[in-house]
């Protein structure tokens, strides 16, 4: 499906769908979400293929990501890189550089008490969207 809608309370349905998207990655995952928290590791990244690398671009207020990332890297190796930027608003998941999904809400709160969606990004739009976020990634700050 190109669009999946979630009613308020359909947290598990969202969880299943996003895990299916993450599981489809063969090389890399690039997640952009200004409000990520530590749950990104336990709820979603554990389902990825162990060889798949992950980049997380989050907002400057997402302090809980740093200790979780450190513990994750300690256990699984340097497969995750986290940066922060105040230049992001969207929530986007890129898979292997050629597929992408937009989340209507932040991943950490998706479908808790409001409706949301996951929409596939059109293949002809992905290169431009990815290029824009790669540029932000380059100027983003590493969590220290």
At which residue positions do the language-model features occur?
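PLD/PLD-like phosphodiesterase catalytic module centered on the HKD motif
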Residues: 1-15, 24, 30-31, 35-144
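Exposed extracellular interaction/assembly regions and N-terminal maturation sites
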Residues: 18-20
């Amino acid at each position: 499906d190109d669009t999946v809608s979630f009613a308020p309370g359909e947290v598990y349905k969202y969880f299943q769908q996003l895990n299916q998207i993450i599981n489809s990655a063969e090389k890399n995952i690039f997640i952009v979400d200004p409000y990520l928290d530590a749950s990104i590791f336990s709820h979603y990244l554990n389902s990825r293929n162990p060889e798949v690398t992950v980049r997380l671009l989050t907002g400057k207020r997402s302090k809980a990501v740093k200790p979780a990332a450190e513990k994750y890297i300690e256990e699984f190796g340097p497969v995750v890189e986290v940066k922060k930027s105040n230049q992001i608003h969207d929530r986007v998941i890129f898979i292997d550089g050629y597929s992408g999904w937009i989340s209507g809400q932040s991943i950490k709160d998706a479908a808790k008490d409001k409706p949301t969606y996951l929409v596939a990004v059109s293949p002809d739009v992905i290169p431009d969207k990815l290029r824009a976020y790669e540029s932000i990634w380059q100027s983003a700050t590493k969590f220290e």
